[in-house]
Amino acid sequence: MEKVSIVCFFFFLLFGSGYGGLPPFWRATVVTMTNLIGGPPLTIHCKSKQDDLGIHVVPFKQEYHFKFQPNLWKSTLFFCSFQWDSQFKSFDIYDAQRDQGICDDCQWEIKPDGPCRLGKKAKCFPWK
């Protein structure tokens, strides 16, 4: 009986107590985006398969951020639309296949030519 209790407790820790079925010790990821479009406010709308984070209007040189826990299967994906003036762009702001292991605190600068990831393995990407 004791072995069954230990196994049940282990599965509870592993799958039952964290957001998205993750253990409580699984590190959260923060995505921060800074509006460097060049003047107009930037309207950001981010989603995953499970969550719609809503619409946010971010003034020039200001930030918008959100926090989540990536899943164990490296399939977490958050995609965002970006709108300013008459421009409408989109980008996968967090793709576990690309970003997991590179950033837990993912800093992005949103520019007219595309988003740029800062930090280790800094890189600018084209819009989708």
Swiss-Prot record:
Matching entries from InterPro entries are given as: Self-incomp_S1
Any coiled-coil regions, as ranges: none
Location in the cell? Secreted
UniProt KW keywords: Secreted, Self-incompatibility, Signal
Q: What Pfam families is this protein classified in?
A: Self-incomp_S1
Q: Where is the signal peptide?
A: 1-20
In the record, biological process GO terms are:
rejection of self pollen
Q: Which protein is depicted?
A: S-protein homolog 5
**Highest taxon, organism lineage:** Eukaryota
Q: Name one GO cellular component term.
A: extracellular region
Where does this protein chiefly localize? secreted
Q: Which family does it belong to?
A: Belongs to the plant self-incompatibility (S1) protein family.
